[in-house]
UniProtKB/Swiss-Prot annotation:
PANTHER family: CHROMOSOME TRANSMISSION FIDELITY FACTOR 18, DNA LIGASE. NAD(+) binds at residues 49-53, 98-99, 129, 152, 191, 308, 332. SUPFAM superfamilies: BRCT domain (SSF52113), DNA ligase/mRNA capping enzyme, catalytic domain (SSF56091), Nucleic acid-binding proteins (SSF50249), RuvA domain 2-like (SSF47781). It is an enzyme of class 6 (ligase). The lineage of its organism: Bacteria, Pseudomonadati, Rhodothermota, Rhodothermia, Rhodothermales. The keyword DNA damage applies. This is DNA ligase. Its cofactor is Mg(2+); Mn(2+). GO terms for biological process: DNA repair; DNA replication. GO terms for molecular function: DNA binding; DNA ligase (NAD+) activity; metal ion binding. The active site is at residue 131. It comes from the Bacteria.
Amino acid sequence: MPDVDPTPDLDLEAIDSEPAAAEAAEQLRAALRHHNYRYYVLDAPVVSDAEYDRLFQQLQTLEAEYPVLQTPDSPTHQVGGPVRDELGTVTHPAPMLSLKAVYEEDEVRNFAETCREELGRETVTYIAEPKFDGLAVELIYEDGRLVQGATRGDGETGEEITANVKTIKGVPLRLRDDARPVPDRLVVRGEAYMRKDEFNAFNRRREEEGKKVFANPRNAAAGSLRQLDSNITARRPLRIYFYEIAPVDGRDFATHAEVLEALPEWGLRVCEDHIRRCDGIDAALAHHAALVDRRDDLPYEIDGLVIKVNDFDGHETLGVRDRDPRWAAAYKFPPRRATTSIEDLFVQVGRTGRITPVAVLAPVEVGGVEVTRASLHNQNEIDRKDIRIGDTVLIERAGDVIPQVVKVIEDERDGTEAPYHIPDACPVCGSEVVLSDDKKQAFCTGGMTCPAQFRERLKHYASREATDIEGLGDKRAEQLIDAGLIQTISDLYELEKADLLQLERYADKSAQNLIDEIEASLEQDLDRFLYALGIPLVGSATARLLAQHFDTLDALVDADEDALTTIDDIGPEVAHSIATFFADDANRGVIDEMRDAGLTLTNPYAEDAARLEGLTFVFTGSLEGWTRSAVQRFVEQHGANATSSVSGNTDYVVAGPGAGSKRDDADDRGIPVLDEDAFHALLREQGIDA
């Protein structure tokens, strides 16, 4: 069964100190990065949009109350999620921003009041349009011809999908110019999606062919556009609705309404049936209510209404704050709900040993999808809601992910219902399960020897953010485990090509490539290796802090909890988790076996760590020989901060080709802007080789 990844259940009002806030912030960052990865990279989210937004807002609140907790890689400074390398990456001519999600009418009215006051208008005109539940894409036309397609990616860079986009029948390869002249360069954005009926037919065909079906149209659309073989994309029933022109070469229009009129004249489809021009927010709210009533009858999935200030002068006045344009809001729909019964409860064991209770439900249809499972998060949640086996419950499914139990319908009880408690022993390895005092966290103590943990740990260990063994994806990791070839991480380094050639889908070249990649992974930066180990509560930021404080792995292994808590941003709970991990003989044994295999760790923070100390950099555009994450990591290794937005604390903006609004923002603030040559010159002045 798939792992159900829990999310932190935090009471922010109970946090009254910086150490406690630091622990909470690290938990939230780790959870958000994980969910970004599942949403943007795997196309397999395990939390609803509402739950993600709740976590995001909690982290925003903590960082606002404790500014010292803000980190350059915090999800609050990101527009979106990470980009895979397989398709290649491109830099967007202008950032593809995300929209602030709101769920209550009061929030919408507050948004509208802000617009009205800051624009100095009695009535603000909005454009209200459906928020499609698909994959955001960008197309670039030059001289009327399609030259590039890309996914949104992290908002600054995206995956290059030109060949795939060209297979979508509704996408013009050449724009019409009979009704309106076509600009020399046009950058348009839209949402790729599948109609419900076409998605259902597509899934039926896959089922008949013995292939895995997609959970929902959004995942199907995203997976189809990310194919390496465009012939596969061509066979998928994809469509695109366009909604925006990026302001990269100045604006030829005064309002968003004018853009929506121009797009179809060029052959770019917009959702004309459900777009409304609204004079005042009441009209937009009425349109939202109408779409809520009609959403199940629409031929495609939408999950809310996007409300935008119509005129672009208003956009300029309101501007962008962090990751959100202040001139727009996404008013999300309420989650779909249904009543069913709990047939059984069981627990799943995640990568870090976290135990998650899951309810087995009597099958019920929610929003057109049959639901048979619901996450219960933790024992505290079970006790608080008094959930028992046999109960009739109200469930909700928001964002097409694993549903949640909203409440028990106690009037339906007949006395046969049975209470449930997380077991004292791990159901997979038999090790002791430790339950926290507040019952919000339970962990299997089996560590690296627990098969359930190991299955997920191996995937994490090989991931791009960890040791980056590119050829060891999830399916291949599962294959190695199921074949009995590896039981611990160190077994990876005992594999031989002959072992792989016995397995399906391996030829001589692919087997040798994987062996070479595994061998290369023995040379690692200390912080990446610490992150790869999957220590509970240790994300990439905490791993970096540890590498900055301890020169070697041995020094960290020998550190006690008191020594660990002297590090800024590492509280007692995180320190206990680290010390417990390295005190475990099985964990230390695995690390020793990896050393015997040739593990070599380099600590990039041990030398020249302060050469750029005190400086804050912002990178924009494309840099030759650097990915965005690589150059940010490089300056951080030399003591600098790397942030995603320009502020009064920014010392330098490094701008390459395709630099967008960040360069303009720097010019407006009088912040030095460096091209790549000037950036390298600065590094040389500090005695740093790049």
